[in-house]
């Protein structure tokens, strides 16, 4: 079997295609969440705290010296990324919770058939007795 044919079979398997679609949708979802946090959530939060722009929170470890740029820790950007992560994690949690709920409904056991009635039990016993009598003859 040629490598191209093997690769085609591998790539067209359902799980691989599903994974690729998931990665693409996940990347797009990440951009939406980043915009939500940076453009919708953080500005009002900064306003409530006192007109603070979280992106500007930073600590300068060393000032710029000539051609050497300053060494700065931008912890405000880190705070925004934490918000991004929390929102994405919560969205994934809710999606998995929904999928698990749907799977549980599919896996519900079939209804147990009712116990045979007295007549059915009696008829079964009569049938078995007749079989025994026929086997003796």
Curated annotation (Swiss-Prot):
Q: Where are the transmembrane segments?
A: 10-30, 76-96
List where in the cell it is found: Cell inner membrane
Q: Does the keyword Transmembrane apply?
A: yes
A molecular function (GO) term: mechanosensitive monoatomic ion channel activity
| Job description of the protein | Channel that opens in response to stretch forces in the membrane lipid bilayer. May participate in the regulation of osmotic pressure changes within the cell.
How does the protein associate with the membrane? Answer: Multi-pass membrane protein
Q: How does it assemble?
A: Homopentamer.
The record's listing under PROSITE patterns reads:
MSCL
Kindly give the NCBIfam families that the UniProt entry links to this protein: mscL, PRK00567.1-1, PRK00567.1-4
Which family would the database say this protein is a member of? Belongs to the MscL family.
* Record keywords: Cell inner membrane, Cell membrane, Ion channel, Ion transport, Membrane, Transmembrane, Transmembrane helix, Transport
Q: Which GO terms describe its cellular component?
A: plasma membrane
Record keywords: Cell inner membrane included?
Answer: yes
Q: What is this protein called?
A: Large-conductance mechanosensitive channel
The record ties this protein, via InterPro entries, to: Mechanosensitive_channel_CS, MS_channel, MSC/AndL, MscL_channel
Q: Which HAMAP family match?
A: MscL
A Pfam family that this protein carries is MscL
């Amino acid at each position: 079997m040629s490598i191209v044919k093997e690769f085609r079979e591998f790539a067209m398997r359902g799980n691989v295609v599903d994974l690729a679609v998931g990665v693409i949708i996940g990347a797009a979802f990440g951009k939406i969440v980043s915009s939500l946090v940076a453009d919708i959530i953080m500005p009002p939060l900064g306003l409530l705290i006192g007109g603070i722009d979280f992106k500007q929170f930073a600590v300068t470890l060393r000032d710029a010296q000539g051609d050497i740029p300053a060494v700065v820790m931008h912890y405000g950007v880190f705070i925004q990324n934490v918000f991004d992560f929390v929102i994405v994690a919560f969205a994934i949690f809710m999606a998995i919770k929904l999928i698990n709920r749907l799977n549980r409904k599919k896996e519900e056991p079939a209804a147990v058939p009712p116990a045979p009635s007295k007549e059915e039990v009696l008829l079964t016993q009569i049938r078995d007795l007749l079989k025994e009598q026929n086997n003796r003859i």
